[in-house]
Design a protein with these regions (language model features):
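Active-site beta3 strand of CheY-like receiver
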Residues: 46-52
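The feature encodes the CheY-like receiver
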Residues: 58, 86
Length: 120
């Protein structure tokens, strides 16, 4: 059975790119969210094996969404994907409960390596 994924990013292009990388590697995309609030709501409904989460999104940012998900589901597996590769944000995302971090633009191989570490 394929591992399931929820993709959270406000940019359609990034959601489409991640979906292509992940479905090509045998993952099933259960849903997509454009805001942090949608991400939390969809996580509750879908409970995927993995979440990819952008940091900067309208409404509720990715780090706050990670905190909200981890508060309810401490074992959630979340991979941050953001253009903002600043050290402080990486540390904050990991402290919030994210398991790994990839910086955009990324190579498909780097995304898949991070996914394997997060699911490992």
């Amino acid at each position: 059975m394929a591992k399931t994924v929820l993709i959270c990013d406000d940019a359609l292009f990034m959601r489409t790119m991640l979906a292509g990388i992940l479905t090509g590697a045998g993952f099933e995309i259960l849903g997509e969210a454009q805001t942090g609030t949608e991400a939390v709501k969809q996580y509750r409904e879908l409970q995927p094996d993995l979440v990819t989460m952008d940091i900067v999104m309208p409404d509720m940012g990715g780090i706050d969404a990670v905190r909200a998900i981890i508060k309810e589901y401490p074992h959630a597996r979340i991979l941050m994907c953001s253009a903002m590769g600043q050290q402080a944000l990486v540390i904050e995302a990991i402290q919030a409960g994210a398991r790994d971090f990839v910086v955009k633009p990324f190579q498909p191989s780097r995304v898949l390596e991070a996914v394997q570490r997060v699911l490992g």
